Amino acid sequence: MKLKQIELKNFRNYEDLKLDFHPNLNIFLGQNAQGKTNILEAIHFLALTRSHRTSHDKELIRWSGQEMKVSGLVEKAHATVPLEVQLSSKGRIAKANHLKENRLADYIGQLKILMFAPENLELVKGSPATRRRFMDIELGQIHAVYLYDSMRYNRALKERNAYLKFDQAKIDKNFLTVLDEQLAEHGNKIMFERKTFIEKLEIHAKKIHEQLTHGLETLKITYNQNVKTDFSKELLSRQDHDIFRHQTTVGPHRDDLQFFINDINVADFGSQGQQRTVALSIKLAEIDLIFEETGEYPILLLDDVMSELDNHRQLDLIETSLGKTQTFITTTTLDHLKNLPENLSIFHVTDGTIEKEKE
């Protein structure tokens, strides 16, 4: 899978931009706040219909515009597929092969991506919500049905929580049980998919981590499932408690992940270097896992992370990804990028203007 071309209309600081990409490696070079990250954000938006930087859609539309559009050409094994995502006050419209997808869940996965940015360290040391979002994004690209179940679960959770905010005297437990059954139906599928995904991810990440640490460290990933027994029974047993708390206190919306090195919790006791290595191991593992599950390698987006890694980790990242994935890198300097291949494109970014260096 390769992204051959992208076109932006009123996206962030770009009024009208069209770029053709190298199938191997693309580097966006420039000082901070010039628009480098906006290009990777646009690719992320084209793939997932959402930004990785903001939840406020208005921020994505250029200040003088009322709507924006990101379109691209994705080269797959047997065809080149045009993709397009439009955003306006009316919402999102996603198209694949010029045909509108009625559900975003049917669109996501057309362009598979892996984003690696400095904030990815939050996967290890951040909040449980960050780790749940990680599972949801990656599983949504691999299995469209997971995204569907996740959306249905969140809708049912919202409905149950709204009902729990009623006065206790007005709550009908029979109706609450109906809501419980809807929640459990989709929640059980989510938990099964998450458990399977983490088990497979750990196999790949463990091997990579041992290579990165020369066999000195063993990585373990634990999926902490909030539901301990039967989801339906736990919801039923907690009805009185949930009515008192006015919220649903059990379910996959409270799941978490933990990372261990030699049986030591990395978030609590690991050094920053160890946390970075764990995050890197996971990202590299995802490359092979996505291929294993879908038959397609994802596109790798590296947003200002090379300066965060030492030369050894940089080399591991480049050697593992190149030859498998099309890679996009943003950076302020090439000084810390060692052993770059000759077949690449370099784009110079200055105040929203992009010039491609002659190859």
Curated annotation (Swiss-Prot):
Domain of life, source organism: Bacteria
Keywords per UniProt: ATP-binding, Cytoplasm, DNA damage, DNA repair, DNA replication, DNA-binding, Nucleotide-binding, SOS response
PROSITE patterns linked to this entry: RECF_1, RECF_2
Residues holding ATP: 30-37
UniProt subcellular location: Cytoplasm
A GO molecular-function descriptor: ATP binding
Main location (coarse class): cytoplasm
Its biological purpose: The RecF protein is involved in DNA metabolism; it is required for DNA replication and normal SOS inducibility. RecF binds preferentially to single-stranded, linear DNA. It also seems to bind ATP.
Sequence similarity: Belongs to the RecF family.
Protein name: DNA replication and repair protein RecF
Natural source organism: Lactococcus lactis subsp. cremoris (strain MG1363)
Record lineage: Bacteria, Bacillati, Bacillota, Bacilli, Lactobacillales
Gene: recF
